[in-house]
Amino acid sequence: MGFPKEGEKVQIHSYKHNGSIHRMWEETTILKGTQSLVIGANDRTVVTESDGRTWITREPAICYFHANYWFNVIGMLREDGVYYYCNLSSPFAYDSEALKYIDYDLDIKVYPDMTYTLLDEDEYEKHSQIMQYPPVIDTILKRNVAHLTQWIHQRKGPFAPDFVDMWYERYLMYRN
């Protein structure tokens, strides 16, 4: 597996455990790309849902993917602060087509004051039965929910003060 290069524009593809496409982001600019870490940014990019519907993101976002963790984090810059949407997912993979991951339903929404809510537990339970997630996936995801909430409390990684603002400033250099 290679990794995207800084300045490159890539698609992001989200899949479900059964291999079906879940969602695609048309264009994300890579700000940092290594074997273990990818940081990207997008603004008003087209998103295509599995049923073919499309919509456009409303605000600039910084995307954080790590090869060793079963989650990715999107920091969205809004007028009243940075909101984070964290997807419990497989670590990322990258090929010539796109940056890819498997979405495992559970999400954590983090507010500007760093309070958070775990979302979609019912969807996770339903899909784990339908798609027959193996028990090891459940164990890995629960461990990563704990790891992610620890990062939120410690303001570590993408939750560090100024992380999103710093990467957004870098993104602006590519837009001009």
From Swiss-Prot:
Active site at which residues? R23
Question: Molecular function terms in GO for this entry?
Answer: magnesium ion binding; nucleoside diphosphate phosphatase activity; ribonucleoside triphosphate phosphatase activity
Keywords on record: Hydrolase, Magnesium, Metal-binding
Question: Where does the chain bind Mg(2+) 2?
Answer: D105, D107, D120, E123
Domain of life per record: Bacteria
Its transmembrane ranges are: none
Q: Which Pfam families match?
A: DUF402 (PF04167)
Enzyme class of the recorded protein, top EC level: hydrolase
Binding locations of Mg(2+) 1? N87, D103, D107
Please report which protein family the annotation says this sequence is part of. Belongs to the Ntdp family.
What PANTHER family does UniProt report for this protein, alphabetically?
A: PTHR39159, UPF0374 PROTEIN YGAC
Its function, per the record, reads:
Has nucleoside phosphatase activity towards nucleoside triphosphates and nucleoside diphosphates.
Q: What is this protein called?
A: Nucleoside triphosphate/diphosphate phosphatase
Q: What organism is recorded for this protein?
A: Bacillus cereus (strain G9842)
